[in-house]
């Protein structure tokens, strides 16, 4: 690295192209070595990072009967599993399997197998989120009717069986995003956001607490967030303090909140949740990260020290936490900053016009 180059300077990799329509979601696996993308062309693509930093597409197939809104990775502890949700009102669980080719038994190739279709939603599924691994293989989803549904795989080695274990009515308007808290020290929380423009400011974020003694999720009424704009995304920090969570919310700008955890919500050393009453939480907004009121998606890094947002104007902004509740802008990059070479443009156009996609909608492998 040259002396005049900032250690935090962002340099884009080569353009990757696979979809014929608008890309709705880009998701990295927990190790950052694999990437999944989905788009309005009803397809999903899997990418593997190469040693030189470029991305090689390893799979691309038609996965739904409508536009695909989200694709997410489960923790690698459960295998190479991704989930996708779509405008066709379904959630599909996919699992990668390594098989031997028929021509050469020594040669191996990967195949993505459709394990199951969850089709009990009565409306479009807008977001999905896997639970942290210490809670097992569970999945939360939300839909346009304001409902949150939680599914669980009773056997973590069998991704083909999922049971609906909870259904929560978060809003009477559209749900747009859902996320889990990641702390092992506290009772699990689920935060839900509404991107409905007609919703009131105090009716855009709802947080539920899991009380193990009652085996149910209960709404925390003491947490009422008055947000100025529809909620397009929200995420808990992967690192929690002993007595607090940190929650980032994209509502025009990026709002960062500290949620104070009462002693009754802190789990015992053996992980047992003894009290059965609802804990009394409190919160404080500790930072407002300006994004020209266009924040769309937000993510934390692995240690919770950097927040990155993507905006409606095609700009990616990152902020770094320097001290307690102090954030400074780390970088800003626009899609127009990268100009693909003629060779890259030719490869993308060629792939879009000549490629035939394998469809897995008519076949299920077990």
Curated annotation (Swiss-Prot):
Annotated PROSITE patterns: WD_REPEATS_2 (PS50082), WD_REPEATS_REGION (PS50294)
GO annotation, cellular component aspect: lysosomal membrane; nuclear pore outer ring; Seh1-associated complex
Pfam family, one: WD40
UniProt keywords, alphabetically: Lysosome, Membrane, mRNA transport, Nuclear pore complex, Nucleus, Protein transport, Repeat, Translocation, Transport, WD repeat
Cellular compartment(s): Nucleus, Nuclear pore complex; Lysosome membrane
Molecular function GO labels: structural molecule activity
WD repeats: 18-57, 63-104, 111-152, 161-209, 226-267, 290-329
Superkingdom of source: Eukaryota
Principal location listed in the UniProt entry: nucleus
GO BP: cellular response to amino acid starvation; mRNA transport; positive regulation of TORC1 signaling; protein transport
Function: Probable component of the nuclear pore complex (NPC) which is involved in the trafficking of macromolecules between the cytoplasm and nucleus.
Family affiliation: Belongs to the WD repeat SEC13 family.
Subunit text: Component of the nuclear pore complex (NPC). Probably part of the GATOR complex.
UniProt-listed PANTHER family: NUCLEAR PORE COMPLEX PROTEIN SEC13 / SEH1 FAMILY MEMBER (PTHR11024), NUCLEOPORIN SEH1 (PTHR11024:SF3)
UniProt-recorded name of the protein: Nucleoporin SEH1
Organism: Caenorhabditis briggsae
Gene name for this UniProt entry: npp-18
């Amino acid at each position: 690295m040259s002396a005049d180059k900032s250690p935090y300077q962002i340099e884009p990799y080569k353009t990757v192209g696979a979809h014929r329509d608008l890309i709705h979601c880009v998701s990295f696996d927990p190790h950052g070595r694999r990437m999944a993308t989905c788009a309005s062309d009803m397809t999903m693509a899997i990418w593997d990072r190469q040693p030189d930093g470029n991305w090689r597409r390893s799979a691309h197939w038609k996965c739904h009967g409508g536009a695909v809104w989200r694709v997410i990775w489960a923790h690698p502890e459960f295998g190479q599993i991704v989930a996708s949700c779509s405008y066709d009102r379904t959630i599909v669980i996919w699992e990668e399997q390594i098989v031997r080719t028929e021509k050469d038994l020594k040669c191996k190739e990967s195949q993505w197998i459709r394990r199951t279709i969850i089709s009990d939603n009565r409306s479009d599924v807008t977001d999905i989120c896997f639970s942290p691994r210490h809670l097992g293989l569970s999945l939360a989803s939300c839909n346009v009717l304001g409902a949150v549904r939680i599914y669980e795989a009773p056997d973590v080695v069998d991704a083909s069986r999922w049971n609906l274990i909870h259904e929560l009515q978060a809003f009477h308007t559209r749900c747009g995003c859902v996320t889990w808290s990641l702390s092992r020290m506290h009772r699990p929380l689920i935060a839900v956001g509404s991107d409905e423009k007609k919703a009131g400011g105090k009716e855009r974020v709802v947080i539920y607490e899991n009380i193990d003694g009652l085996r149910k999720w209960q709404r925390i009424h003491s947490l009422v967030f008055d947000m100025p704009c529809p909620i397009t995304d929200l995420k808990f920090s992967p690192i929690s303090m002993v007595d607090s969570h940190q929650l980032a919310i994209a509502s025009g700008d990026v709002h960062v909140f500290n949620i104070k955890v009462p002693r009754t919500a802190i789990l015992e050393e053996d992980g047992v949740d003894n009290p059965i009453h609802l804990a009394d939480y409190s919160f404080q907004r500790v930072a407002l990260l300006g994004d020209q009121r266009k924040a769309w998606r937000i993510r934390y890094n692995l240690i919770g020290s950097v927040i990155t947002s993507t905006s409606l104007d095609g700009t990616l902004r990152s902020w770094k936490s320097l001290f307690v509740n102090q954030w400074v802008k780390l970088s800003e990059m626009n899609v127009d900053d990268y100009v693909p070479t003629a060779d890259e443009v030719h490869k993308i156009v060629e792939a879009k016009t000549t490629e035939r996609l394998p469809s897995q909608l008519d076949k299920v492998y077990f």
